[in-house]
Amino acid sequence: MNHISSRTFQVFCIATLLLCGGHAHRSFAQTPTPTPAAGPQFLSITVVSVKPGMNAEFQDFMKNTTNPALKKGGLMWREVWQSTAAGGDAFEYVMVSPVGKFAEYDGAGALEKGLGAQGFAAWQTKASSLVTSVHRFIVRTRNDLSFQRQPAGPHKLAVVTSIHVAPNRNSEFENYIKNDYMPVMKQAQVTYLVTQTIFGGDANEYVTLTMRDSFADLDKGPVLVQALGEEGAQKVLQKLPAGIVVHVERSLSRLVPELSFMPAQ
């Protein structure tokens, strides 16, 4: 992936996992344990870079035009995330929504259904005046590698780690996460979510989300160290076979509830 796609992909997966696992909504609630889902769960991720100076107009367009049309067109939910002031592109947004079946892409999307053909054409013209780039991905949530603690409410902050794995070593990496790393997150009762790119990006990239309630949580140090101490944390990290991970990036992202919508309860 190019520089922007790689960085934004980290953030998009944030939403990805969050949507699928970070809430207790009926449409995507998960159990507190990493029990595999009955079948693959796919998500559509749209990463948008807004033109400088157009942020307020973009948000207004999202709230008053885009979201109502998506709801009318049948989309059940969509979450929007943005990089935090602590790091990342302040003009970048990540939208996450469910993919029920790939056959959905054979016809008109929810936006076009909600606006009609002429309205959709007008929407495209307006949207193109507000953004500098748009990139779409489809990802698969990896419930078998994740732990979901039932939260008191929606997560507000995520530590997003993008991990590029060496070709043909995916199974080794997944075994490490499942058997060594994720159990520590479960022990610490910290939500830890994993996703994998299917279309639109690097198929050897995984994105993990460590959910936090506030920046103050970060002052407590890494979860592994909190749970096991320095020596114990190092022992877990040393179990990862050499050469599996070729690149790692880390960022912080926050939920933008005023631009998101959830299914009715």
State the predicted function of each range.
Residues 17-27:
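C-terminal segment of classical bacterial N-terminal signal peptides
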Residues 8-9, 22, 39:
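Generic alpha-helix initiation/capping and coil-helix boundary signal
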Residues 1, 20-22, 86, 201:
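Intrinsic disorder/low-complexity signature
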Residues 1-7:
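N-terminal secretory signal peptides that target proteins for export/translocation
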Residues 29-265:
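Short S/T/G/P-rich N-terminal loop/turn motif that feeds into the first structured element of a domain
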Residues 8-16:
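Sec-dependent N-terminal signal peptides
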